[in-house]
Amino acid sequence: MALERTFSIIKPDATRRNLTGKIIDRFESAGLRVVASKRIHMTKAQAEGFYAVHKERPFFNDLVSFMISGPVVVQVLEGENAVAKNREIMGATNPANADAGTIRKDFAESIEANSVHGSDAPETAAEEIKYFFKDEEIVG
């Protein structure tokens, strides 16, 4: 077991429905600590940069539009095997395929409006964390 950090976004569909606290409770109840957090309204440029890996995918423009449609909460979560644990808590990308008791099964509206984003690997987490946070903003 390794202590690691992962990156999380609580998406506009969840912030719009005041689910931020309930989602954070899921992370904390599973043993993850929030070591950095801020509520922001992403600019189009921020969203395009963050999701640049998907630039050639057919859903890119819709994803960017959705992510700038309202406030999001960007966070750094820390804990044992944080990346894998967060992905387990979130559930499958498509809420129809997510296990009962996961964030996406319980709160998501659709595959796009699926309430949360989480890093898929420790290397990705490090990149995503640096995209939104300075080192001094992360307090463990």
From Swiss-Prot:
EC number of the protein: 2.7.4.6
InterPro entries recorded: NDK-like_dom, NDK-like_dom_sf, Nucleoside_diP_kinase, Nucleoside_diP_kinase_AS
Record: active site: 117
GO biological process: CTP biosynthetic process; GTP biosynthetic process; UTP biosynthetic process
SMART domains for this protein: NDK (SM00562)
Localization annotation: Cytoplasm
Cofactor(s) it depends on: Mg(2+)
Keywords: ATP-binding, Cytoplasm, Kinase, Magnesium, Metal-binding, Nucleotide metabolism, Nucleotide-binding, Phosphoprotein, Transferase
SUPFAM superfamilies, alphabetized: Nucleoside diphosphate kinase, NDK
GO molecular function per UniProt: ATP binding; metal ion binding; nucleoside diphosphate kinase activity
Pfam families: NDK
GO cellular component, one term: cytoplasm
Residues holding ATP: 11, 59, 87, 93, 104, 114
Catalytic activities: a 2'-deoxyribonucleoside 5'-diphosphate + ATP = a 2'-deoxyribonucleoside 5'-triphosphate + ADP; a ribonucleoside 5'-diphosphate + ATP = a ribonucleoside 5'-triphosphate + ADP
Subunit details: Homotetramer.
Known role: Major role in the synthesis of nucleoside triphosphates other than ATP. The ATP gamma phosphate is transferred to the NDP beta phosphate via a ping-pong mechanism, using a phosphorylated active-site intermediate.
UniProt record similarity statement: Belongs to the NDK family.
Stored HAMAP family: NDP_kinase (MF_00451)
NCBIfam families: PRK00668.1
PANTHER family: NUCLEOSIDE DIPHOSPHATE KINASE
Protein name (Swiss-Prot/TrEMBL): Nucleoside diphosphate kinase
Taxonomic lineage from the root: Bacteria, Pseudomonadati, Pseudomonadota, Alphaproteobacteria, Hyphomicrobiales
Gene (name only): ndk
